[in-house]
A protein has these predicted regions:
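Glycine-rich phosphate/adenosyl-contacting loop at the front of the ribokinase-like
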Residues: 1-64, 69-79, 144
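Ribokinase/PfkB-type carbohydrate-kinase core domain
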Residues: 1-13, 72-90, 102-159
């Protein structure tokens, strides 16, 4: 019997804005047609891919989704997969989001990130007694500042 995988950490909404060109400081550029909204971050990206690869694989999501429309969107998207357990997702504060500027000419992207609840996610937010999985995956460390704090024994809390 499969025990499954827990995907923990960032739950992010990515809003992608196609732009004509990257402007210099104090200059203007136009946002063109094709603005998109999608889920992102380690939890959403990893768990949805795993759910599609094996619909029978038990999966557990752990992280923060805000008490806002973006948090509702994150839960709705992950909720499309019957094998994703959302019981360890906490609703708190604002949902993390990234405004992605996608240059139509060069295809390069620039990311503006708002941490939201992800800034406070830490080991105390994981119900270790309830969690019964074979694999625990967590990320993205640089977007989880509470877990990136120094630790005398291991270097950082996440280590």
């Amino acid at each position: 019997m499969k025990k499954g995988i827990c995907c923990a950490g960032n739950m992010i909404v990515d809003i992608t804005y196609p732009i004509e060109t990257w402007p210099k400081q104090n200059e203007l550029t136009h946002i063109t047609e094709g603005i998109t909204r999608s889920t992102g971050g380690s939890v959403c990206n990893t768990i949805s891919d795993l759910a599609r690869l094996d619909p029978q694989l038990p999966l557990v999501a752990s992280g923060f989704a805000g008490h806002d429309a973006e948090g509702d969107f994150v839960l709705q998207e992950m909720g499309k997969y019957k094998n994703i357990d959302l019981s360890m997702v906490r609703r708190s504060g604002d949902t993390s989001f990234t405004a992605v500027m996608s240059n139509n000419q060069t295809k390069e992207r620039t990311f503006f990130q708002y941490a939201g609840g992800n800034a406070y996610y830490g080991e105390d937010d994981i119900d270790w007694d309830k969690l019964d999985v074979d694999i625990f995956h967590i990320g993205y460390i640089l977007l989880l500042p509470h877990l990136d704090e120094p630790d005398a024994e291991y270097g950082t809390k996440m280590a």
